[in-house]
């Protein structure tokens, strides 16, 4: 049978067309903006890379600690612009308390809102970061599995978040 023959020194060609067709959403559909209230939203960023560790790619996301689900996520550099994109996705939601770590841009962006800066109140999202690292090898710090393109990096991680949190 032609499908069972060994490759004899040639690696099989991977077809990434199915991954490139993915169109993951960036906001959950489980929580209805305007009708549901998010009491405690934890925000954090997670480091990843594409091709080489010098080409950093950051995942910013918000986590509803009571529903134990990701509310929204964006990819980009670790800048105010990326944080602003995440905040614009979260603007339709009624969030009572924001909980973040001590990154200074959170404090400047959440000025005027009820904002708690504490490692104690970001334990759930930090645990979720660890779960993402365990489930997705491309997010591991020391791994042979890494993303070769920004497009596939964003789509694969976005698709994982869609399956686990948004549907």
From Swiss-Prot:
Which keywords does this Swiss-Prot/TrEMBL entry list?
Answer: DNA recombination, Plasmid, Transposable element, Transposition
Keyword tRNA-binding recorded: no
What's an example of a GO molecular-function annotation for this chain?
A: transposase activity
What InterPro entries does the database record attribute to this sequence?
A: Transposase_27, Transposase_27_IS1
Domain of life of the native organism: Bacteria
Q: What does this protein do?
A: Absolutely required for transposition of IS1.
Record's NCBIfam families? transpos_IS1
* Family of this protein: Belongs to the transposase 27 family.
Q: What is this protein called?
A: Insertion element IS1 protein InsB
Q: Specify the species.
A: Escherichia coli
Name of the gene: insB
